[in-house]
Regions:
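Generic structural signal for well-ordered, non-membrane alpha-helices
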Residues: 74, 100, 120-127, 234-241, ...
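Short, contiguous, pocket-lining structural segments
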Residues: 201-212, 216-235, 252-259, 279-282, ...
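Helix-loop-helix junctions within predominantly alpha-helical proteins
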Residues: 62, 68-92, 97, 129-221, ...
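Terminal membrane-anchoring module of integral membrane proteins
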Residues: 2-67, 143-153, 157-162, 253-417
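Membrane-cytosol interface segments
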Residues: 2, 17-18, 22-31, 97-120
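Inner-leaflet juxtamembrane helices
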Residues: 105-126, 226-236, 337-364
């Protein structure tokens, strides 16, 4: 006889089966993408995915089309600026940051065109899986993470604005020139633009909006990775509860191992399908965050290690640095490190949870060890269920330790230069 969780699928409506599912998990972040002008999918305000449509023939195109055009223009400006002034780490950093934002925007556009097929493929599998327990609790957790990442994005915007406005006032605005404050700010924060084009307030405001879009976009990518990691972990935990419940069943009511094997195969397919469509975003998320961490480490250690000696006082007395610079760099560095650790730890739980059934399978009595249990054991052991970055790396606890070790090695090398 099938386990109760499997039998409960019978007579359950499609709406109930999809509660706490893939679409409900990612719907709110996608709505945010829609609002900031980079996602051409309509119908996201509905709780059902059947209303989702990719369309450029709508009022929304008035927002989306200029956004893409402006991003493309800024990418070309960044590339020209980099070669016109013979490179430089600041120009290279700005180019890498904008390329990450631009790449995500293009990936979102191409993904939007296939969205209806993707959501149909995923929900087809979800309808064959046992209904998730505590779906309301899972959705509440999802909303909490979305809120936290959105607040983090706004905090990052405010922190950058406060820092750049302060530096503009200190370095680029002379006494009696308060009327040129806004112009000085735009020239200081967007040198790659006004070194090659005449000054324009309109252009400055547009580029500032694009910059805010980039901050929110990159943070929401991290948010989506976290949310889908939680969703897949919940799916695997629910499966693990079914498997471990087998040990407490009597012989006549125990589920057949072949059913558990088939169920694990379905969940494996779900993980692999989601990873196939998500892994470019995972790759961009990690490369963007790690490149920023390395750049900040280089800047901090370069300032602190004059004459191969760490002198914080000299760092603070530098005419181009003050305590606000140190505070800004330290806060931004700490926030990005915390964000990377949060994303990595939660995403690594997918792989860790997928290995849990082995604890039971390795301790089965001889009477229970059959060809089906052996097949399930082999499948669990060799199935690398985890999120990946374009299959270049898989997010596991081992990968997290390796990443930390690499950053520490990078820091030691910088200290020795």
């Amino acid at each position: 006889m099938a386990p109760r969780s499997v039998r409960s699928m019978v007579g359950t409506s499609k709406k109930d089966m999809l509660k706490g599912g893939f679409y409900e998990t990612v719907r709110i972040p996608l709505c945010i993408y829609r609002l900031i002008g980079i996602l051409p999918i309509s119908g996201l305000w509905y709780r059902s995915s059947k209303y989702n449509r990719f369309s450029l023939k709508s009022f929304y195109t008035i927002i989306y089309a200029p956004t893409i055009v402006m991003q493309t223009f800024l990418l070309l400006v960044h590339i020209y600026d980099l070669f016109a002034f013979f490179f430089g780490h600041q120009r290279l950093g700005r180019l890498i940051y904008h390329m990450n934002f631009y790449t995500i925007t293009i990936l979102i556009f191409t993904g939007s065109r296939k969205w209806e097929n993707v959501i149909k493929e995923i929900e087809t599998i979800e309808l064959t899986l046992p209904r998730l327990r505590n779906s309301k609790k899972a959705l509440a957790l999802t909303k909490s993470f979305v809120f936290a990442f959105f607040v983090f994005s706004l905090a990052e915007v405010v922190l950058i604005l406060q820092f750049t406005l302060r530096l503009t006032k200190q370095r680029h605005v002379l006494p009696g020139d308060s009327g040129l404050y806004l112009k000085s700010y735009f020239v200081y924060i967007f040198p790659y633009l006004y070194d090659h084009f005449p000054f324009s307030y309109v252009m400055g405001f547009i580029v500032q909006i694009i910059k805010v879009q980039g901050i929110i976009t990159l943070n929401m990518v991290n948010c989506i990775v976290v949310l889908l990691s939680i969703y897949l972990t919940n799916r695997l935990k629910h499966y693990n509860r079914i498997v471990f419940a087998k040990g407490s069943k009597t012989k006549n009511t125990r589920p057949k191992w072949i059913e558990l094997n088939l169920l694990y195969t379905k969940i494996s397919n779900l993980v692999k399908i989601i990873d196939k469509h998500l892994n470019p975003f995972v790759f961009i998320s990690f490369t963007a965050n790690l490149s920023y961490i390395c750049a900040q480490l280089f800047y901090i250690l370069n300032k602190l290690t004059s004459s191969r000696t760490v002198k914080i006082t000299s760092f603070l007395e530098d005419k181009r640095s003050d305590w606000e610079t140190l505070l800004y760099i330290s806060l931004s560095f700490a926030l990005v490190v915390l964000k990377v650790l949060l994303v990595s730890i939660i995403a690594a739980e997918v792989h860790t949870t997928s290995r849990e059934p082995l604890r039971l399978l390795y301790t089965l009595p001889t009477t229970e060890y059959t060809i089906e249990t052996q097949r399930l054991m082999t499948q669990v052991y060799y199935s690398n269920l985890s999120l990946s970055g374009l299959n270049f790396f898989h997010i596991t606890r081992g990968m997290l330790l390796g990443m930390v070790a690499t950053l520490l090695t990078y820091e030691i090398v910088l200290l020795q230069i």
